[in-house]
């Protein structure tokens, strides 16, 4: 399993990759633009090519993922917001594809009371439209649907919901899944023991399919199990705990899936010691199953 880190791109894409290498990350995740602004960052073809070249120069960082802005809401019942979200998703995906990223992680959004079934067709249509507009080739950058913590009317709070979205998009092979450990915990899906982790892997396989699981977001939780709130905590300092995370990370089915550390969420993000801690948790999980 690759242990990666979310890195800041305020100084540019290539410096972000360099920072990932400096802290010992095997993979990086980068926002393609400010996560709380609509205006996409404009990267020239030369800048995107420079990032792809830098990846070859830093083989220790084996994978790049991008994260879409938080403002996107494909499930919105408001036509203006839905259209704005689709355009923003397309812009984010275009940048990720130009960087050679292995996936663009997306929070689907909230139906705001209109209901999951009502929002489902629009969500699926928007996903496929963005994928087609950027790159119809199946080898292009996929969109990775992230599981939600379950707050309010968010879409994707369960793997059953994520499977329904993919099904509504005719099973498009350019759609994958990103599993966030804190969101799992907050949405009331247990995984903190070896038997519970085994059950979770079976659930994923029978809903979205393990082949669609492309990356993990590795976070502890500030809130209790089932609290339905998105609140990340540093590894080992939250209500999941290092042992709970180890139970999941050690599962054999996940060893080819990059795990992206998103904490600490303040300052410059994950540090060398945080990446080392995550590796220790992984090693403990593997030892438990040896």
What residues fall within each predicted segment?
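N-terminal pre-domain/capping segments
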Residues: 1-68, 72, 76-93, 284-290
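Active-site beta-loop-alpha junctions enriched in small/polar residues
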Residues: 6-10, 33-35, 68-71, 109-111, ...
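Aromatic/hydrophobic pocket-lining residues that form the small-molecule binding cavity
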Residues: 13, 48, 85, 89, ...
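Acidic (Asp/Glu)-rich catalytic clusters
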Residues: 18-24, 43-65, 92-100, 128-139, ...
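Conserved, mostly hydrophobic/aromatic
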Residues: 20, 67, 85, 96, ...
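Residue-level preference for long, well-ordered alpha-helices that form the structural scaffold
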Residues: 40, 44-47, 78-81, 85, ...
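Active-site acidic/histidine proton-transfer and metal-coordination neighborhood
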Residues: 74-176
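Histidine-acidic metal/acid-base catalytic patches
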Residues: 163-290
């Amino acid at each position: 399993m690759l242990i990666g880190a979310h890195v800041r791109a305020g100084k540019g894409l290539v410096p972000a990759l360099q920072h990932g290498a400096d802290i010992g990350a095997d993979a990086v995740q980068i926002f393609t633009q400010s996560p709380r602004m609509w205006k996409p960052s404009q990267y020239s073809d030369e800048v995107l090519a420079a990032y792809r070249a830098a990846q070859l120069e830093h083989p220790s960082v084996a994978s790049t993922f991008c994260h879409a802005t938080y403002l996107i809401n494909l499930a919105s019942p408001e036509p203006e917001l839905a259209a704005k979200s689709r355009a923003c998703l397309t812009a984010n995906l275009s940048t990720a594809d130009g960087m050679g990223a292995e996936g663009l992680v997306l929070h689907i959004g909230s139906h705001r009371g209109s209901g999951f079934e009502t929002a489902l067709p629009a969500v699926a249509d928007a996903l496929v439209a963005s994928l087609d507009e950027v790159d119809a080739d199946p080898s292009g950058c996929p969109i990775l649907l992230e599981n939600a913590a379950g707050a309010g009317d968010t879409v994707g709070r369960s793997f059953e919901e994520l499977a329904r979205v993919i099904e509504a998009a005719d099973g498009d092979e350019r759609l994958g899944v990103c599993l966030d450990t804190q969101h799992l915990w907050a949405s009331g899906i247990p995984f903190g023991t070896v038997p519970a982790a085994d059950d979770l892997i079976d659930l994923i396989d029978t809903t979205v399919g393990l082949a669609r699981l492309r990356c993990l977001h590795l976070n502890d939780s500030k809130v209790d199990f089932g609290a339905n709130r998105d609140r990340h905590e540093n590894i080992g300092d939250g209500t999941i705990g290092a042992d709970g995370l180890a139970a999941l990370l050690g599962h054999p089915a996940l060893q080819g899936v990059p795990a992206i550390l998103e904490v600490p969420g303040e300052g410059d993000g994950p540090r060398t010691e945080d990446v080392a801690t995550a590796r220790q948790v992984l090693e403990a999980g593997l030892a438990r199953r040896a």
